[in-house]
């Protein structure tokens, strides 16, 4: 996104002046190299790990277009909370009014309009999402740059937004109505969150159309609209009549039990008198080895070794094969578990099968632990 920003800015600032282009590129190159040299002690190791990451080296499908549902959700997602290929926008409704006012202004804000149109095109084409994500998979995590642009547009348009003329009010009102009708006609954008956001925008527009209100109070109206939009998004996200996201939360006590609970307790007791122990199983917690200090067969990190993912793929391990950075055991295969030097196998009492060659050892309230009769030492497999 930075490269696109610089290119567009150079075009608008320098035009066809080749000399200024050369000076600008040279100055930018020197500054970039200087910055990279200053950050090399951190940048180079991270770059090395990133380029050798399993997700970066794993072939991924690249579609020419997103699914239809993606495009159907986009209009509503501009002003309401939501996630669609990590296209998280959910801007406050005054941003929509500012964008409409910007495009109403002829021969003004050309650079901002260009940035907005380029960003909109990038959101609609999967290639840009994949390119911005290191060519690993389609994902619009770069959307924070678009959010920064929209915030800047609101700041630039604020003086005009609080001093709207009649023609501008009519234009924004008609455009807001068309936007609302389009969203209501599309199933994927039709929801209570959008109705609340548009209602806040309509009330704000009516308030800004009143003439005998000073500029300070108009600014306060916009601020209140931003706060109400954020509050409405939060209510629809967490309330029981909305997505009920808050119901997924647990108490601090339950969180501590999940993190330091029975899995850790059961395996830690058995590992007290052992120099090395590795365990596998079903229904286990990811990255529990960070807490227990005991090696396991479950892993879920952003950056992982590509050779491990290739080994799992070659062995046709079906569990989470589509996520090369997420390992879930060894498909409960006795041979692979033995080759991984796993001497213990844990099964959740809520469900799970025990592979061949394991005998019962102990249990607690949530897990049953089995001993591997065919365990191999760590050095045997390396």
Placement of each model-derived feature along the sequence:
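Perimembrane helix-loop-helix junctions
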Residues: 2-34, 200-209
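Short secondary-structure boundary/capping segments
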Residues: 2-5, 48-62, 133-136, 241-249, ...
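Short, well-ordered loop/turn and helix-capping segments at boundaries between secondary-structure elements
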Residues: 6-13, 43, 130, 151-155, ...
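Membrane-interfacial segments
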Residues: 11-16, 50, 54, 161-166, ...
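Periplasmic/ER-lumenal interhelical loops and adjacent helix-loop junctions
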Residues: 24-28, 32-115, 119-140, 144, ...
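C-terminal, active-site-flanking charged/polar segments
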Residues: 54, 58-61, 144, 148-154, ...
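Contiguous transmembrane helix-bundle modules in multi-pass membrane proteins
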Residues: 111-127, 131-259
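Soluble catalytic regions of membrane-associated enzymes that act on cell-envelope
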Residues: 221-382
């Amino acid at each position: 996104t930075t490269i696109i920003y610089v290119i567009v800015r150079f075009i608008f600032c320098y035009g066809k002046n080749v000399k200024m282009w050369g000076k600008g590129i040279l100055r930018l190159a020197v500054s970039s190299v200087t910055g990279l040299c200053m950050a090399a002690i951190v940048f180079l190791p991270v770059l090395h790990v990133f380029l050798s990451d399993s997700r970066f080296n794993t072939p991924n499908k690249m579609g020419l277009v997103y699914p239809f549902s993606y495009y159907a959700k986009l209009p509503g997602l501009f002003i309401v909370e939501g996630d669609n290929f990590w296209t998280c926008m959910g801007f406050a409704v005054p941003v929509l009014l500012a964008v409409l006012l910007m495009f109403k202004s002829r021969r003004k804000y050309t650079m901002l309009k260009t940035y907005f149109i380029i960003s909109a095109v990038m959101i609609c084409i999967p290639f840009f999402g994949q390119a911005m994500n290191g060519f690993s998979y389609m994902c619009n995590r770069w959307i924070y740059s678009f959010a920064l642009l929209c915030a800047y547009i609101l700041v630039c348009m604020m003086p005009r937004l609080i001093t709207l003329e009649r023609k501008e009010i009519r234009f924004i009102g008609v455009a807001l109505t068309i936007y609302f009708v389009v969203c209501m006609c599309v199933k994927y954008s039709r929801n209570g969150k959008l109705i609340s956001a548009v209602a806040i925008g309509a009330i704000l527009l009516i308030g800004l159309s009143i003439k005998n209100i000073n500029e300070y109070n108009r600014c306060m109206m916009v601020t209140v609209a931003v706060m109400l939009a954020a509050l409405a998004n939060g209510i629809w996200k967490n309330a029981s009549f909305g997505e009920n996201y808050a119901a997924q939360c647990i108490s601090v006590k339950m969180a501590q039990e999940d993190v330091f609970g029975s899995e850790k307790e059961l395996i830690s007791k058995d590992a007290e008198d052992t120099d090395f122990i590795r365990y596998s199983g079903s229904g286990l917690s990811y990255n529990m080895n960070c807490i227990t200090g005991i090696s396991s067969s479950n892993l879920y990190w952003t950056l992982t070794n590509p050779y491990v993912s290739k080994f799992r793929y070659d062995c046709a391990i079906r569990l989470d094969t589509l996520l090369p950075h997420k390992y879930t055991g060894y498909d409960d295969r006795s041979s692979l578990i033995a080759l991984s030097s796993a001497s213990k196998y844990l099964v959740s009492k809520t469900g799970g099968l025990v592979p061949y060659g394991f005998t019962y050892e102990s249990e607690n309230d949530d897990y049953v632990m089995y001993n591997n009769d065919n365990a191999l030492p760590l050095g045997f497999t390396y």
